Structures are given as C-alpha cells and as structure tokens.
Amino acid sequence: MATKASSILHPPNETEHTMSRITQEGKKLTYNLKVIQQPERARACGAGAKSSADRRPVDPPPVVELRVFESDLNDQHKTDITFSYNANFFLFATLEWARPIAHGRVQTQTPSCPVLTGVPVAGIAYLDRPTQAGYFIFPDLSVRHEGLYRLNFNLYEEMKEPKHADKGGLVPHSQNHMAPLTPSKPRSPHQFLHFRLVVKSVPFTVYSAKKFPGLAESTSLSRIVAEQGCRVRIRRDVRMRRREPKPNKDYGAYDDRRITPDPYPGTPVERPRSASNASMDDPYRYPTGPPQVQPSPDYGYHHPSHQQPSPNLAATPQSHLSFGAAPPQYHAPPPPPTAHPAPPPAYTSPHLGYTHTRQLSAGPEYDPHRQKYTQYPPPSPHSDIYDQSKSSLPMNPSVDHPSYPPMPYEQRMSDPKLYAPPSQLHPTQQYQQPTPPPPPPAAIAPHPPHQRTPTKPSPSTFFPPTPSRLSVEVDSSNEADDAILNAIRTRRGYILDEKSGATKRSRDSSDHDLKPLRNGQRPVVSGDEAAKGEIGETSGGSDDEIMTYRRADGRLVAKQRVSVHSKGKEVNIPRDVDLLPRRPEVCAVAE
C-alpha cells in the first residue's frame, strides 16, 4: 500500500482550487471551486454494443461547489456575490489516469472511443443547502475500462455584463448590438466563453463487472441536493455486496450463500386432531348417545387388573392424510360369534393388509363376548359406518403400498381401531366363524333400548349360509391372536347382492335415490337389476373398496381397492376378480 500511495501524485489543485482576476472597474473577483463529494468507485461498462444498456454510474455522484467573492485590490472587504453575480457557469469533466504513465518511444495508438461516457457537462444550480452557493452535480458519469482514475473539472464562464470583463480584454456586447448589420460579412464573435480554473478529484477505482462491490447507500449530501429539485438517484437500501474471502474462487460477483439451505418456513406439521368430532359429523344425522354401558362380570369376561379410561361419547374420525396412524380414541370391539358350521381347512383370506383409517364406531347394541377381545368399554353409538365421503383416500391395488412393521401382540390386542361393531354389517354378510361357548341367556337379554333405524336387524339375527350361496370361509383358529384378521373379516370379505333392498345402512334414508353413487356405481331400486346380471351395492360394503364393472367380453369383474398386512407379511390381493354371472343373486370375490 505504501508503494501504491507513493506512486500517486497529489497535484496542488486536488479537491479545491482558487483563482482571481481584475475587472474593468478595478474590482477583484475570486473563484473558489471545491469538490465536496468525491467519487469512490465505479463499474467498467465496456465498449461493446451493450455497454450503454448496462452502465453503472460513478458512485457517489461527484458534487462541486462554486463560490464567487468580490473585493478590492488589497483583498479587503471581501464579499460573497455568488447569487448576485450575473453570469453563466458550466463545468466540464474529463478523465485522467491517477498514476503517471511513462510514454515509450513507440507512439501508441489513441483509443478509438473515449473512456469517459455519460453526461460530462453540468450547469450550475443555486441551492440554499448545505450552504448558499452554486453546485455542479454529475449523476451520470461512467467509465468504460477498469483502472485507477481521477476526474478533472473545468470551469467555464459566459459573462453578461461589460463591467465584469477582464481589464484590457474583450468586452462583451450588449443585447442591442448583437444584431449584425451586414449578415453576409464574416465578423468576430460577440459572446465569449472564458476558461476560469480546473480542480481535480481524488483517485477512485473502476472495477470490472466481476469485482465490483456494488452501489452504496446514497449519502446525506445527495439526499439534500435531491430534496431541492436536482436529479440525483437516491438509493435507500444498501446494495453493497458482502464480500468474503473465497480461496478457491476468484469470481467476485458470487452471492454469499452457502451449501446450507436457507431457513425458509417449511410445511407446518399437522397438529393433533381434537378429541371431539363435532365439526366432522353431521349434528342432525345422529341423536345424542345414551350413557355408556359399563362392563360387568355378568356380561362376560372382565379384566379387573387393567382399568382404562372410558373413551369419549363421540369418537373422532381419523384424518385422511395420516395413513396408518393410530388414533388416540378407542373404537368398538369385534362382533360376537354366531352359530355356523365348522370351517373347512385353513383358508388364507386375501383381504388382509392395509389398515384403513376410516373410523368405525360402535352401534347401540352391547354384546358380552366383546370383553373376550378387549378390556375397553364400548363407546356410545353414533354411526354404524363412518361417512364414506370422509373416509380415507381410495387405494388403487396397482400402487405399491409401503410395508409396515408387525404390531406386537399387546398392541394388537389393545388397539381399538382394529375392531368393528356388529351393527355396521348386514346379517347376510357375516363370515363363517366357529361357535364359541354360548353365553347365558341373562347376558344377552339386557340391551340398550336406543335404536336409530327401525329396519336395522338385531345383531343376534344372522342368516346361515345356504347351499345356493357362495361363501368364502376363513380359518379363524387364531382369531384371538390375529386382531387384524378379525378387523378385516368384520369389514366384509365377500359381496352379497340383496334383492329386496329393504336392509340398508342406517345412515341412509329409506329411499334408494338418496344413496350416494361413487366410482361408477349405479342405483339399485329393486331386485330386477340383479336378475339381469347387474350387481348392486352391498348394504354394508364400502363404496371405495370394491368396484364392479363389465369387461368387453361380457364378464362382470370386481376390483379390490385395498391391500393390508397380516403379521408383518404383505398379502397380495388380486386386481381383477371375475364374478359369477350365472348367479347374480350372490357374488363372491373369489381367488
């Protein structure tokens, strides 16, 4: 830095310069020119075709102050006549190298284009602030090439009054003598521009586009000048690039970002759902639930060693965005076993796998054998099947579902969402299950008197399978151990078509036209469509689990939309299953 500072010359007229002259009247006029705002930096704009489009001015804009004083020859009684002096002033800026350059013997070619560009001329502006004086402002000066330069400001004056002319010099003509008498004759000029003095700025650096540090915030002097009507660009934000040492990069225009991502606000984590489903369920659809029926030893098996808090009267349906997440509420236990023939050899149900997030709440009926599978008291009834429109997203079997780890035995036994109430299934859709020890009559007699739909059958009423029907039998030898198997069997393992249509979901009205139609379903108004080969919707089935359609060859095909897990093993469910068109009254999802 010492070598660099020593190589730069400091002329006597740097920053401030003064000159004096004697007028025709013997008065002494003194011109004081001072650079009150020095240029500090600039960006080289180049000399190409696009140099004028992307041009950075010298920052900050140079401001030069002019003051004119009048005094006698002895330099006494000096008076500031800047505002009263009648003359025109303008300042012309030129550019020069800050370091002296030794010229070689070979004559170098002059540059084809000027290095300084922009508006190098400024007229005087008489301002009151910061002090009463004349100011020259250069807001649009640019340099084409990088280097270390300084600006030269040359003051020119155009006199208007003869008394202000130099002593012994040319006197400017008055306005009445300006009209030429003989226009065809050449004449000497009547108006003159007089060079008064020059002042130099301090050296400033012109950077390349890669190393330019950016524009700084506008100075207070620029703001003061702009407030008084001068055209100066005011920058209220700092645009200086924060330069940091880059050992392996020499590109100054890089942003100061790092590999670490910016702390943008991410997607907010879903907060836990409220324990109340008052905003989810229709308040006019279900009546207020009766008091809960507490388990007692007379109603079945009881576990006095495990006392769990009773669930809420209204269970909250699980969000359709949280797949496989266990809700904090307790749900209904599995349905009671019924008297059916003994099952054939073990049959693996294809409907094991994906755990639905659909809320299945308990019906009003109470069965003592539910205590065999869980120790939680059943919640109050409000719906046999959660509203299909609020159910989980339809699962396409072609999409591979992520495998979930198997649940422990204690978690499966205590997970209430795996059990479904008996009121959500139609009696004709019950699976075949081995007959447990029959309960005493006194245990079956007490039931809550509340019934939502008159047409809903009692859970103890079940039709035994007839030889004319196809039934899918499931090995239930490990039903107490496999809670997922029980949940899947209670959700329906096959489809039965009902001709009469008298028994429907309790949430639907008695009219078939009010039933929602989804996924290409068709309304079933009577049993005639079943005779024609049309498969109706299952009364207890889910609208988004099984879809029936007819192929081009006339075959009726059902597509299963779910896939579940059983004991940590994924069970693949066939995508397309042919239904038997010869028996439209009962169709099973056959393997």
Curated annotation (Swiss-Prot):
Limits of the Velvet domain: 26-235
Positions with biased composition (Low complexity): 422-433
Cross-referenced Pfam families: Velvet (PF11754)
Region (PEST): 452-493
Region (Disordered): 1-22, 238-547
Keywords carried by this UniProt record: Cytoplasm, Nucleus, Sporulation, Transcription, Transcription regulation
Record-linked InterPro entries: Velvet, Velvet_dom, Velvet_dom_sf
Residue stretches of biased makeup (Pro residues): 330-347, 434-448
One biological process term in Gene Ontology: sporulation resulting in formation of a cellular spore
Stretches with biased composition (Basic and acidic residues): 13-22, 245-260, 494-516
Cell compartment(s), UniProt: Nucleus; Cytoplasm
Disruption phenotype: Abolishes cleistothecial formation, switches to mycelial phase faster, and shows impaired switching to the yeast phase once in mycelial phase. Attenuates virulence in mice and macrophages.
Positions with biased composition (Polar residues): 306-321, 386-395
Motif, Nuclear localization signal: chain positions: 40-45
Domain writeup: The C-terminal PEST domain is a region rich in proline, glutamic acid, serine and threonine residues that is required for the light-dependent regulation of development and secondary metabolism.
Family, as annotated: Belongs to the velvet family. VeA subfamily.
Known function: Component of the velvet transcription factor complex that controls sexual/asexual developmental ratio in response to light, promoting sexual development in the darkness while stimulating asexual sporulation under illumination. The velvet complex hat acts as a global regulator for secondary metabolite gene expression. Regulates cleistothecial formation and hyphal growth. Acts as a positive regulator of virulence.
Name assigned to this protein: Developmental and secondary metabolism regulator VEA1
UniProt lineage: Eukaryota, Fungi, Dikarya, Ascomycota, Pezizomycotina
Originating gene: VEA1
